[in-house]
């Protein structure tokens, strides 16, 4: 098969920095890349995951506009939703044999799943599904039901009940939750995805560099909401999507203290940007079915200032150190809760006032995989935090530290978030990370 990802492979050789916007594919080109990646994932990744989790048959059932989140990631680029009732069956006949991909539908699902419903032989769709199950006689039939992971709980009550009603009793003991398989499918990035993910993160960084600059921000005139909507409009102009509404907030030398609850549960108030403000932005895009989630800081230079005040940069460096502390704790099979505890213990030993709330990222912004803290659950997250780390999962390294700023007479928080991936070679940032506070204007 022609490798449609080659144009991306040469981009790192061009000497891009975070200020350069990579070329963005048109819709037809995107569709070709999406389908190439999807075919590769199903043919090469899915069999490995099914064997790892011990499920030899995976059944997914969804109706149009009410799709299972997992099924939605398996639809080809030209399918924007399921059709009527779509049934997907993946069957692993064993080592050395090719994965069987079956659609119990009137038509094939693109080139990926062959339609196998002979309406003359089986007028009822459910009967056709049961025939496939009886013919393959699997040891375990995985269905997407999960108490802890919403993304792995996509089999709705109506379809679940209908399935069990028609399934012969002898197969009922073989029904198992496909939670681990669903999470593995969603969280694991393929080699092809890891080839393009750095460029997707680069696009997000480049948009931030453009929007939080003297081009857009004029102290005393521009509001935080102006910047937010500039970001939304710019994403739209580029033909991209955003999976959440951005935020831009301000910390400055005034009596107002940092409101932890407001920061995480409410949108910041609209404020005019002034000289000497420390701006924080939270922003993410969706492109080629992958998401980004980035938080960075920008300082608006006062007239005559040439650089960021040292005390602010020192505060920033503490959060950078916390990033390192956290990612140094990543280890295969270690749970998110253990990673969280070890990182917070190390941060405390170094005198950092730290908070960690890191999450996987990929097909979804807050994606499947181990949760490493929530902003309001620093003691661990039951269920999602107990899930172990595997290789080739991408993470948004999201956290903050608190620091006293003597000249401001107050405590500030430096909240950072950058996307990276944990592989057998360790953790690395997909497009680097912010290493110092950016100035407005740039120097």
For each of these PLM feature ranges, what is it?
Residues 4-14:
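Sec-dependent N-terminal signal peptides
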Residues 19-443:
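Active-site neighborhoods and metal-handling regions in enzymes and metal-associated proteins
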């Amino acid at each position: 098969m022609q490798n449609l990802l080659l144009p991306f492979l040469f981009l790192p050789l061009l000497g891009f920095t975070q200020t350069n916007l990579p070329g963005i594919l048109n819709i037809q080109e995107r569709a070709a890349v999406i389908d190439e990646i999807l075919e590769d994932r199903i043919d090469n990744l899915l069999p490995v995951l099914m064997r790892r989790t011990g499920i030899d048959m995976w059944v997914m059932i969804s109706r149009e506009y009410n799709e299972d989140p997992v099924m939605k990631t398996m639809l080809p680029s030209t399918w924007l939703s399921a059709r009527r009732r779509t049934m997907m069956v993946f069957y692993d006949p064993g080592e050395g044999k090719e994965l069987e991909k079956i659609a119990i539908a009137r038509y094939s699902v693109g080139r990926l799943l062959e339609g196998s419903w002979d309406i003359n032989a089986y007028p009822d769709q459910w009967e056709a599904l049961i025939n496939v199950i009886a013919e393959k006689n699997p040891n375990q039939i995985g269905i997407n039901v999960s108490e802890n992971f919403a993304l792995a709980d996509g089999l709705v009550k109506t379809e679940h009940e209908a399935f069990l009603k028609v399934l012969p009793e002898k197969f009922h003991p073989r029904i198992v939750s496909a939670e681990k398989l669903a999470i593995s499918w969603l969280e694991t990035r393929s080699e092809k995805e890891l080839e393009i993910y750095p460029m997707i993160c680069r696009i997000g960084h480049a948009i931030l560099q453009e929007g939080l600059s003297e081009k857009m921000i004029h102290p005393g005139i521009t509001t935080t909401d102006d910047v937010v909507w500039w970001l939304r409009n710019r994403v739209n102009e580029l033909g991209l999507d955003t999976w959440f509404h951005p935020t831009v907030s301000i910390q400055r030398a005034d009596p107002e203290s940092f409101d932890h609850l407001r920061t995480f549960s409410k949108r910041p108030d609209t404020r005019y940007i002034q000289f000497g403000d420390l701006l924080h932005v939270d922003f993410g895009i969706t492109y080629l079915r992958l998401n980004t989630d980035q938080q960075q800081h920008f300082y608006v230079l006062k007239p005559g200032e040439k650089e960021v005040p040292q005390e602010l940069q020192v505060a920033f460096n503490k959060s950078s150190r916390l990033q390192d502390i956290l990612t140094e704790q990543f280890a295969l099979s270690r749970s998110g809760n253990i990673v969280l505890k070890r990182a917070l213990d190390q941060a405390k030993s170094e005198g950092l006032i730290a908070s960690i709330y890191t999450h996987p990222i990929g097909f979804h912004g807050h994606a499947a995989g181990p949760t490493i803290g929530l902003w309001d659950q620093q003691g661990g997250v039951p269920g999602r935090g107990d899930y172990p780390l595997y290789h080739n999962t991408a993470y948004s390294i999201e956290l903050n530290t608190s620091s006293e700023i003597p000249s401001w007479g107050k405590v500030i928080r430096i909240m950072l978030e950058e996307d990276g991936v944990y592989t057998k070679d360790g953790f690395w940032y997909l497009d680097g990370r912010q290493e110092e506070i950016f100035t407005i204007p740039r120097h």
